[in-house]
Regions:
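Surface-exposed loop/turn motifs at beta-strand-loop junctions within extracellular Ig-like
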Residues: 32, 59, 76-78
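Glycine-centered coil/turn sites that cap beta-strands in beta-rich domains
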Residues: 1-4, 8-32, 40-43, 52-55
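Extracellular Ig-like/FN3 beta-sandwich strand-entry sites
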Residues: 23, 48-50, 67-69
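Signal that preferentially marks extracellular ectodomain short beta-strand elements
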Residues: 53-65
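C-terminal tail/sorting-segment detector
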Residues: 14, 40, 45, 63-89
Length: 89
């Protein structure tokens, strides 16, 4: 579970691997350093393998967010992980 580039400017690619044979519900959200939800990036069922999502540094309304540290939360039926990302404008 990572993002590249990090730090990033315009957008970043979030990559993660699922090792469960059966498709499972995956939720990927972006939070600011205060713990406030900024963007609901993905919610759906995914199967085994590598997966990639792109975050363009915007909120749920499509407005660009400010520079700072953001936390990407990857939640599945079995685990919840967080990853720190730095947006520099």
């Amino acid at each position: 579970f990572s993002n590249s580039p990090n730090p990033f400017n315009a957008d970043t690619e979030i990559t993660f691997f699922l090792d469960h044979e059966q498709p499972e519900l995956v939720i990927v959200d972006i939070y600011n350093i205060k713990g406030q939800l900024v963007r609901s990036l993905f919610e759906g069922k995914l199967g085994i393998g590598f997966h990639q999502l792109v975050w363009e540094g915007d909120n749920d309304r499509g407005v660009d967010v400010s520079s700072g540290i953001y936390l990407c939360r990857l939640h599945t039926e079995k685990v919840t992980l967080f990853h720190k990302m730095t947006l520099l404008k």
